[in-house]
Amino acid sequence: MKYLFVIISLLLLGCENNHTLKEETILWEFHPKNHQDQWDLQAFQLMNEYQAIQNNFTVSDSVAFKIAVQQLMNSTDTLLTHSTATDSLTQNIWISGLQIFKNELEALVLETEPSEKQAQLNMCTVAFIHFLADIGYTKTNVYIFQKPDEDNGYFWFGFNKTSKDPFDLSDRKEYSASFTLQEP
């Protein structure tokens, strides 16, 4: 009888916990304890190069887009071989995050369909933001945008509080940042 009461209580609690709202997925979490000034300088260089990719994607300049992606991949390769971490644990954070980002860039180069390229650019953005959060990037504010649209839940980032959607050429409206990297 005692066990039946416990089971019924758990079932009632389970029924009471109704998840009708869309659950928010945490894609990154800022880790200030991992911050290193040298990493900020190197990551800032990568951010500027990534901005060139977003900008060239917006104007649909395929040659400039491919050049910008290749340049960023070369910079990523260089930084992977020249780690400036203070210890092996933080070095693993740097190397693994940068390698994941590089893998996403390589997948971006392989995409040919525009919709798949958009989705892959979004994956690159999420991987890069995750990398910046993991290394505790603080050199500049990083504003993260997500258009409030069911069809396009893509992320992009910038250095300003407002930005245009690089995924939708017909929408030239300025959007306010949805998140800031350095804030929870």
Where do the model's predicted regions map?
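Bacterial signal peptide processing site
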Residues: 16-19
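Juxtamembrane and targeting peptides
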Residues: 21-23
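C-terminal motif of bacterial Sec signal peptides marking the signal peptidase cleavage site
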Residues: 11-14
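Mature extracytoplasmic or organellar-lumen-exposed domains after removal of signal/transit peptides
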Residues: 26-184
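Phosphate/NTP-binding elements of NTP-utilizing enzymes
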Residues: 8
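Positively charged n-region of N-terminal signal peptides that target proteins for export
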Residues: 1-4
